[in-house]
């Protein structure tokens, strides 16, 4: 997992987190989360601690100022770090269920975490030992949570194709639903600006643009229909696994699809309108990406030789940045810790289990019907032969 903030970069893999301050030549901050305290069982509830829990990091994010970094792991810990003036662990708190996503509020005062049971909890950043507060809930697993740029809305998406927009000050008040996806909604990204636009990605292979206040769909892009300059594969799923945005020179978007060895680059034109500007093919399937504050696109490649890639837009085309000292230094540190990071988080089909099971009842019905007809035909044939033999015996 790769995350960039205004103060630097964070990389996670397995239970490890590497934190790097922008422009620093010092070795990155390195922590194994398995070394942190674990939640103890309450008296009389020895079974409350899950013995199957690992320390794998599940979700992470920087605060808008870059001053804080938070992550959650498979042991149901919410770990908060301070990144300025140096990286250090501030607190370890616990969540009730394993989390699928987390984000900070625009003011940086709260952390919102979404979990597998469909709930969203908020945690205070300043009161770093305070327990979380339940804000809202869905009836199915949440896959992402976001906050509108003005901080007025909490936006959530779930396994059952729904995008829900709730008021921050009264989360039980639902402002709108953005409905149209035909599979689980995997990614949410509110776009900067005053137009109240939301971008969503899904397992149905579409990228959709919404007016989230009204719930109106503005545009839908079918990813399988884009000209990517590569051979089309039958039944290929374009599951959106990551979206990142840069607003330095207009709104530029970078997107990844699970199992697709390349980067989709879009721009948001007036209208508004999503336009594919470029597809960058890679030799390895990228694991993650993010923009930094200077409009550079960083890519976690999963390749031991070149674990980090950096791109810059020049004359309307995204080009690889070569001989970058910071990338070279960080890549070397990643290679040194490659085994601990488990290949910086090797590719996994995170969303494969979320697809609806297709039950072909018609095929089963036809097989049973054919078997029934064969049995009836055999019985009829046997019934016709028996009387004929009796007649012959009578004539004798």
UniProtKB/Swiss-Prot annotation:
Signal peptide: none annotated. Pathway: tRNA modification; N(7)-methylguanine-tRNA biosynthesis. Belongs to the WD repeat TRM82 family. GO terms for biological process: tRNA (guanine-N7)-methylation; tRNA modification. Its main location: nucleus. Non-catalytic component of the METTL1-WDR4 complex, composed of mettl1 and wdr4. It is found in: Nucleus. Residues 376-396 are annotated as: Disordered. GO terms for cellular component: nucleus; tRNA (m7G46) methyltransferase complex. Non-catalytic component of the METTL1-WDR4 methyltransferase complex required for the formation of N(7)-methylguanine in a subset of RNA species, such as tRNAs, mRNAs and microRNAs (miRNAs). In the METTL1-WDR4 methyltransferase complex, wdr4 acts as a scaffold for tRNA-binding. Required for the formation of N(7)-methylguanine at position 46 (m7G46) in a large subset of tRNAs that contain the 5'-RAGGU-3' motif within the variable loop. M7G46 interacts with C13-G22 in the D-loop to stabilize tRNA tertiary structure and protect tRNAs from decay. HAMAP family: TRM82. This is tRNA (guanine-N(7)-)-methyltransferase non-catalytic subunit wdr4. It comes from Xenopus tropicalis (Western clawed frog). Keywords: Nucleus, Repeat, tRNA processing, WD repeat. PROSITE patterns: WD_REPEATS_2 (PS50082), WD_REPEATS_REGION (PS50294). PANTHER family: TRNA (GUANINE-N(7)-)-METHYLTRANSFERASE NON-CATALYTIC SUBUNIT WDR4, WD40 REPEAT PROTEIN 4.
